[in-house]
């Protein structure tokens, strides 16, 4: 969602801040701004509604807008509409701040501040923090003691970066529920909500823990815990290059990331193998003990990651013979849920910073789970650091808001997890494990084959040019894949799309079917084929337009006139959900192009949802 960048250097930081904001554009935003302390100790602010490029133009048009310390922000509106006044940074007399998150008690605090004579220029919760700093700051207190005292007045989840004339050579940052990472350089140091934004200036990072306070000087970074005790700065090198965030000649990040999936899924599989076999070491040394205790699996996630979890439920129960439930994080977080004896808490998140998923994990630690595992794409993210064990996917940097390669690598990770559990529980023989492992190894080739449908899918996307509604159908293991296909289409083309289990057509959705309703379905080679074809016949009989992605092994069984049928080699249970996902992603992409939408940054959506 919102993005923070801060820099404290011996050089002018204006361009560093702007370039950092550009790297954060993928997170979603509606306005941007930055603030610097100039050589006369003045705080100068520039803000614009719209894209970062507009902010860059405004800054370059200002004479002498430069300084060696500053903070910047991309805003995704939560309190107050998108406007210059509501854009960050926000300032009081001596303090200037940028903020991610939500201050839940801002209305009460604002009322008190107004009664005390403080004037507000915006409708945001953020400006409350700036005035609260001004009101409550005590010059005879240390920076840490002041921050502890003032931040204790705030309720909610937030990350804050502060510059001030009271400490004009420092940036102060606070993490309470929203992620922050320190970037370490030579005679310069940085703060950001995402390491990706700082890759052009450093590859050395330290992630703040919950409750941490950081004081960032040019030549030093001090970190304190929520009790005010000093901590060691643990710095790690980040192995992504800044080119990871480029389009590499593709028109959109999403298309690039769709085409990166053969490598992404292959890398995820290869990382789990030792001597050609799936290894427990790809999880953690503690995994064997934890998995042996597991009698039930509770998967918790949001959005696309939830759909991956739904797919895994079918695998886990069919092959590992372990009962599995799948929960939406924003629901289980607030529900008085009953924990099954021997239940393992499994969270899934691409970023590892999804607010509801993270808070659900924290809640689980107070409950009777045997332990926690996460599946994540970002090393050192909060979810990874706070889970007992982690399986890291190898998707690489994903910029497009609509997840593609993160989803397919999550599926692969969950397939590997299923086979590991099945082996430990003796639910499958060694021969069966070896067979399914070979199937996973073959996914790369199958995904590459599915990508060859791109031209045909581009051609059929024209059919959707005047459509406003679509139904997706899938059965059994492929129902979650239909849900994911519908989610992709609605996310980036703004077509209203819903997914249903094929067997549920008679229970309501069939009423929507007519000659103007596109019906997208996947037809795998599985034990439910006859049932699936029967359901599709019901749609066909009522004039619905069928767009079918069919496993070539059953192509001859599919005979519906006036329908669009594309065939592919999908493989079997462990590969087919991944492979069928590819044409659904391509369909969504090409329909969005036809509709003229912003594919990489669809309206109202953010890549990393770090607030509720």
From Swiss-Prot:
It is an enzyme of class 2 (transferase). Residues 2-219 form the Glutamine amidotransferase type-2 domain. The keyword Transferase applies. It is found in: Cytoplasm. Residues 287-427, 460-602 form the SIS domain. GO terms for biological process: carbohydrate metabolic process; fructose 6-phosphate metabolic process; protein N-linked glycosylation; UDP-N-acetylglucosamine metabolic process. Pfam families: GATase_6, SIS. It catalyses: D-fructose 6-phosphate + L-glutamine = D-glucosamine 6-phosphate + L-glutamate. CDD domains: GFAT (cd00714), SIS_GlmS_GlmD_1 (cd05008), SIS_GlmS_GlmD_2 (cd05009). One of its GO terms (molecular function) is carbohydrate derivative binding. The active site is at 2 (nucleophile), 607 (for fru-6p isomerization activity). One of its GO terms (cellular component) is cytosol. Its main location: cytoplasm. Keywords: Aminotransferase, Cytoplasm, Glutamine amidotransferase, Repeat, Transferase. The keyword Nucleotidyltransferase does not apply. Its EC number is 2.6.1.16. Catalyzes the first step in hexosamine metabolism, converting fructose-6P into glucosamine-6P using glutamine as a nitrogen source. PANTHER family: GLUCOSAMINE--FRUCTOSE-6-PHOSPHATE AMINOTRANSFERASE, ISOMERIZING (PTHR10937), GLUTAMINE--FRUCTOSE-6-PHOSPHATE TRANSAMINASE (ISOMERIZING) (PTHR10937:SF0). Homodimer. This is Glutamine--fructose-6-phosphate aminotransferase [isomerizing]. It comes from Francisella tularensis subsp. tularensis (strain SCHU S4 / Schu 4).
